[in-house]
Amino acid sequence: MSGSYPFIDIAALDSVREGFARGDAQLVLAHDLSTVLWVNGPGAKLFGYNRVEDLIEGQLDLPVATRRQIAAFSSENTSAPSAVAVRLGGGLRSELTHLHVSNIKLPDGVAALLVATQMPDNSAEAAISGLGDDSTHIALVDAVGKVVAASLRFALLDISASTLEDLIVEAGDATDRIVKRRIRTGSHSVPGAIARLTDTPALHLLCIVGDAPAQFQTAAEAVPLPDNAEAVLEEILPEQGDAPAQQAQKTHAEQPRPKTFAFDHDAPPARFIWKVGPDGTFSEISPDLAAVVGPNSADMVGRRFSDVANVFGFDTDGSIAALLLERDTWSGKRLLWPVEGTRLRVPVELAALPVYSRDREFLGFRGFGIVRPAEAEADPEEIGLALAGGIPQNRKPRKEPAETARMVGEDDVLALSEEVANDDQPAAVLPKPPLDITPTPGRRDSDKVISLLNSCAQEKVAADQAKFLKEKERATRPEGGLTKTERNAFREIAERLRKQGLANTRAESETPVSETSSIEPVEPTPPVKTRSEPIQPDETALLANLPVPVIIHSGDAIHYVNQALLDITGYESLDDIRSAGGVDVLFNSESDDGETRQSMVLRHADGSEEPVDAHLNAIAWRGGRALMLSLMPVTAADLPAPAELPAANDEEKQALEAHVEELKTILDTATDGVVLIDPEGRIRSMNHSASALFGYERDEAEGKFFSMLFAIESQRAAMDYLHGLSGNGVLSVLNDGREVIGREAKGGFIPLFMTIGKLPHTRGFCAVLRDITQWKRTEEELTNARKEAERASNQKTEFLARISHEIRTPLNAIIGFSELMADEKFGPIGNDRYRDYLRDINRSGNHVLALVNDLLDISKIEAGALDMQFEAVSLNDAIGEAIALMQPQANRERVIIRSSFQSNLPDIVADSRSIKQVALNLLSNAVRFTAPGRQVIVSTSYELNGDVVMRVRDTGIGMSKSEVEQALKPFRQINALERRKAESAKDWRNEGTGLGLPLTKAMVEANRAQFAIDSNPGQGTVVEIVFPPTRVLAD
C-alpha cells in the first residue's frame, strides 16, 4: 500500500482507530478536498473502489455540492465532528449519506480532514476489506492472540501463537500504541507492524510486508527454467523411443488447450481457496482446484461438506466434519479427491480459520488447500468416471498405480521433505507437459531419467543451500552447548517429526506439508512419477549428523541411536546397547548411597557416569508412535559447587547430638501433637504428645500414611491440605489451618485443629495438632445458652400476648360499667362519695388498660412482630393531633404547650399510629414533670442535609445522666417526687408505669428513625427524633 504516510500510522490515530475497528468507512483528505491521503477498505468501497491502493494518493472527484458542504466545515477551527448529509453516486441513482467530518492532525503534525460514516456491514472482515495482496498481509488480532479476520494469504505466513502474544504485549506497552519491527514467519523474519485499535475488548491491527514462504509456492513459481531447457527436453524424448508421443507433445505445445478437461499428472502442486458458511455449506471455491481435478469434481458451491464427503467417499471417520463444528483453527487434514474423467484420485490437504463478525457471531470458515496431482493413486470406486460420464475417447487411461510404483528404483536417494530441505531454496523441479512413459523390460527406471540441470543450475542449487544454512544460523537465538547451525538442524528434525505425529490433530498456525522431492548429491533429478503411497523421508538422515546424542525408543525398546550417543557412551552399535540391558543400563537414577538423584545421569559402557540434561518429545516413527530423547552433557561450570564443610571433631559432634536431644525433649514436652511427614505422605516420626493423643506407639505409626490418623470424613480434607502445601500456590502463603476429626487407635474420635508447614531441606512436612475438645464443649454450651435465651424470650412474648387478651375483657367491663354508673343514666346515686369512687374505678381501669397495651406493644417490638403500616405521614398533622389530645391535661396542670412547625415540611415514610403514640408519650412526660407556670415547646424542622427533625423541649425538673439511663430501661422509674414540692406531689396513679420512654424509643427505631435525649437537672429535657433522608418524601 503506497502513500506518503504508512497506513498503520494513520489507522492508530485516536480519532481513527475506534472507527476503523468498528468497520466504519473512513477517508482522510487534504484541505484541497481532492487529494486522498489515507482510506480504509469500507471507505474505498463507499466511493466505488475495490482496493485501497486505487484511491490513496489519488484524486477524488467529489460532487460540487458535497465539496461545498465539506469545505464549509473545514474552515471551522474545531476538532469536534460535524454531521453532513450529502448525496453520493450519480446518474439515475443518488443516495443520501450522513458523513461525519472532523479536523485531525497527521503523525507529522499536518492538518487534514477525516470523513467517516457507519456502514451496514460491521464485521471484522469488512474492516480489513480492500487490504492485502501478494506482498502485503493484514489481520485483526484479539487480546489473546487469536486471529479474528485476515487477508487471503495471511495464513500462509505461518506466524506462531507465541509471536502474536509477544506482539500484543509490546503494543500494549508502547506509548503510541504502535510497534514496528521484523516479525518471525516460519523460518523467515519480515518487516511488520502492529497497532492497538481498541482497549475493551482489545483489538489489534497487524500488517506484514513480505512474500509468502517458499514452501507455499509451486514449483513453476519457485524455479526459473534453465536456459537450455528446451534442448534438454529434446534429448529426453528420443531416448524414450516413442516418436508419436513426441509429436503429440509438440502439437500440444503449439495448439491451445482444449475446452474439455484433461488431467495433467505431472502438474506441480496447486493451491486453492475455499469458504464454508456456519452450516458447512461451500460458498466459494477458487478455480485452481477445478484446473487440477476438473470442473465437475470441483463443483461444490451451494453444497454441504457432509454431502460432498458422502458422494466422494472421503472423511469416513467424520474428523473434518467434527472440526467444522468446533469452530477452531485446524490444519493438516488430508483426503483423496476424485479426478474427473479418470480412475484416479489425488491427495488434498486442507486447513481453515474460523471467521467471526464484529459482534463475535460465527460466520463460517476461510481455508486453503494444496492439491498434489503428481501423487495421484487408483480409485477403486472410479468416481471420476461417473463425474465425466466415462473415459474420454481422445485420452488413454494412465498406468495403474501398482505398475507405476515398480518404476521407483530401490537405490533412489531419499532426502528431507520440502518442509525442511527446501526451506528458502528453489526446488529443482522442471514443469513439463503430460507424457506417458512406457517401461522397458530389463532397464531400471533411474536410467531413463536424465538431469535437466546443467552445471550452472547445479552451482545455483549449491549456492542456495549455502545461503539457506547461513540465514538459518543467523536467525536462531543462542542456547548453551550447541552452535547455531547444530541447534537449527536439531530443531528442524524435532519440528518435522512432531508435525508428522500430530497430523490428525488441530494446530493453530500449522501449514500443510508440501510435496517430497528427491535430489541426488551429484546429479539432481526431478520428482519420481506417481506412486500408490508417497515415499517417506528417511527419519535418520538428519539425526545421524547431529552432534547431540539422540535416542528413539518406545518404553524399554530402543529403535534408534545416533552416532553422537555411541561416541559418548562408548558402545559400538545399537545391538550392544540392547544386549547390555537397553534403556535401563544407560541411565542411573540412584546414587551409591541409595538416595534418589535429582538430575539424570548417563552411564557409559565402562561403568563411568556423566550428568546430562534431557529433553523428551513425542514423535511419529515409521508408522507408529515413539519418544525422542535428546541429551546434553552438563559441564562442570553448570554443576553447583559442593559445599565445603569442615571436618567436625568429636567435641562438635557431641555438642550437635546434645542439641538434637534437647530439641527432641522440647517437642516431647509440648502439649500439642507434632507429626513429621515425608514427601509421599507417610509418617516419619511423632512426639510423645501426638503418640498419647492418638494412642499409637512411635514405631507403630512410622511408615504408615498420614491419613490413618483421621476419621473417614476428614481424610479428604487433611490430604487436600497437605497436597495444597506441596505446590507454591496461595495455600502455601495463606496457611490458616484446618479443623479435622482425629481417630484414636481404639476407634474413638477427637476434634483437632491442625496446622501443617513445609520442611526446608527434606521436602517433607510438619503437622501440629491441637486437641480442641474443651473449645468444642464451650462452643456447644454457648450455643445451647443462646437457644435457651431465645426460647425464654419467645415464652415471655407469648405470655404477655395471652395475658393481655385475658385481662382486657373484664377490664373493659369494669371501665364501661363505671362510666355508665357515673353518668347516672338509670337513676341517681344519691351520694357524692360514691360518685368519687366510681371516677377512681374508671381512672384505675384505664391505667391498667394502658399498662397492658404498653406491655403488649413492647413485647411485640422485641419479637419483631409489631404490625406497622408504612405510608406517607404528615409529621405536623400527627403532632398537632397529639397536642389537641394533651391540651386539657396541660390546662389542668397549668402548663403551657407551644408549637413551632416548619411550613412546607415534606412527608415522612412511617407508621401513622406509632408516630402519634410517640408524640403523646413525649408530651405526657413533659407535662407530668413540668411545674405549673412553665412551658413545653414542640417544633419540627427540615435540615440542609435532608433530615426531618422533631423536638420536644420542656422546662421541667430535668434528669441526670444516670437517671436518663435508668429511665430508658423498661419498668424502671426515677425518684422524681423527692425534687417536687410537697404540695405538688401526686399519687402513684399519675406517676406512670416506667414504660413510657423505653416504648417510645422502641417505636422510633421501628420507624427507622433516630432517638436522642438530653437532660440537665433543674433546666429541663430535650428529646430529638431524626428521620433520615431515606425516610423523607422530598419533592
Swiss-Prot record:
Annotated CDD domains: HisKA, PAS
Region (Disordered): 500-533
Cell division in keyword set: yes
Annotated segments matching region Important for polar localization: 1-613
Coiled-coil blocks: none
Localization (cell): Cytoplasm
PAS domain segment(s): 659-730
Chief place where the protein resides: cytoplasm
Catalytic reaction annotation: ATP + protein L-histidine = ADP + protein N-phospho-L-histidine
GO molecular function terms attached to this record: ATP binding; histidine phosphotransfer kinase activity; phosphorelay sensor kinase activity
Entries under InterPro entries matching the protein: HATPase_C_sf, His_kinase_dom, HisK_dim/P_dom, HisK_dim/P_sf, PAS, PAS-like_dom_sf, PAS_fold, PdhS_histid_kinase
Top-level enzyme category: transferase
Nucleotide-binding as UniProt keyword: yes
Region spans: Interaction with DivK: 614-1035
Signal peptide coordinates: none
Domain Histidine kinase: 802-1031
Role: Functions as a polar differentiation marker. Essential protein that, by localizing in the old pole of dividing cells, controls cell division and maturation, probably through control of DivK phosphorylation status and cellular distribution, which in turn regulates CtrA, a transcriptional regulator of the minB operon. The asymmetrical localization of this protein is probably required for cells to enter a new division cycle.
Subunit structure: Interacts with DivK.
Name of the protein: Cell-division control histidine kinase PdhS
Protein's organism: Brucella ovis (strain ATCC 25840 / 63/290 / NCTC 10512)
Gene it is expressed from: pdhS
